[in-house]
Amino acid sequence: MTEALMERLKTFLNREDNSTLVGSPASQEEIAHAEQRLNVRFHEDYVHFIRTFGGAYAGLAVYAFSNGTSIGKETVVDLTLEFREQLKEHSFAEVLRAGYVISIDGSGDPIVIDQAGKVFICYHDSGEIKLLADSFEALIEDCFYEW
């Protein structure tokens, strides 16, 4: 992720009034264990984000292992395994099997990073899948704004 974007995120998330939006930084051990459990390799931009902020809000809730209290306790592992099981009959099941769920939209649809680093949303009601961004960094650039 660009240094400029990381600085914007740090300035926003380190404000005292935003303390519930940022979690605890992920450890290398947590990341390695999750990658092994999910049989994936996390994209370097996602790793940079969660090693800096943990699970945090950046225009959307980004789940990791220790999330900001306003985000919830589910981890990236919990969400990925849950959606892989729930949506195993959908046409996009392979995307879920090969990727990992980093967020959920307001309708309960998983937002997934695939092994190429592209970000998709999987609509559980219609069975459709849509490309949201070409990378995690592009997703955050599109979604994040300071208030």
What is each stretch, according to the model?
Residues M1-D109:
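A surface-exposed partner-binding patch
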Residues Q36, D125-S126:
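A generic, residue-level signal for flexible/boundary positions that often mark functional hotspots
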Residues A98, G117-K118:
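Beta-strand-connecting loop/turn residues
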Residues S103-D105, A116, H124, S135:
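Structured loops at beta-to-helix junctions and adjacent beta-edge loops in soluble globular domains
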Residues D109-Q115:
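Broad, structure-driven detector of short, well-ordered beta-strand segments within folded domains
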Residues I129-W147:
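Compact, glycine/acidic-enriched structural inserts
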